[in-house]
Amino acid sequence: MKNKVLIGIFTLLLFACGSGEEKKEEKESMNSRDEIRLKQYQVQGAKVYATYCANCHQQDGKGLASLYPPLAGADYLLENLPRAACIIKNGQSKEIVVNGVTYNQMMPGNPITNLEVAEVLTYIGNAWGNEAGLVGVKDVDKWLEECED
């Protein structure tokens, strides 16, 4: 009887220890998936940026004098990703302050999908020295539902 109990406890401990390794491997593979998604979003986001954004914000993300704000090193962008998602999708006609400079040029909304918003935010959030990391489409979905007019 004691042997059966000991074998049962040993088996339970063996499976409990083994599941920790599986979770560790699963977590590492999720990180790998996120790294792959980050790279994919950056590549696709660069295409979206070139099509819809670069004309005003320039290829180097430095903006255009006092007309269009920079995205490179932009405090507003990095501190307000949810608001940036809303601006990209819906446009903006209000005044905006970026790196201490006030801009009052209207920005039209863009006819792009929520996935493309996530991709372009990932691209500009990690280009030109910015370090925002991966912007997921689920985050963008949530942010766009909460946009203020």
Residue ranges and their predicted role:
Residues L14-A16:
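C-terminal motif of bacterial Sec signal peptides marking the signal peptidase cleavage site
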Residues E21-V48:
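Electrostatic cytochrome c docking/interface patches
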Residues G8, S19-E21:
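Acidic, carboxylate-rich catalytic segments that either coordinate divalent cations
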Residues K2-G8:
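Sec-dependent signal peptide recognition
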Residues Q40, A46-A72, E79-P82, G91-N99, ...:
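Periplasmic/extracellular electron-transfer cofactor-ligation site
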Residues S66-A72, S93-C147:
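Axial heme c-ligation environment in periplasmic c-type cytochrome domains
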Residues Y41, N80, A84, E116-V117, ...:
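Stable alpha-helical elements in mature extracytoplasmic
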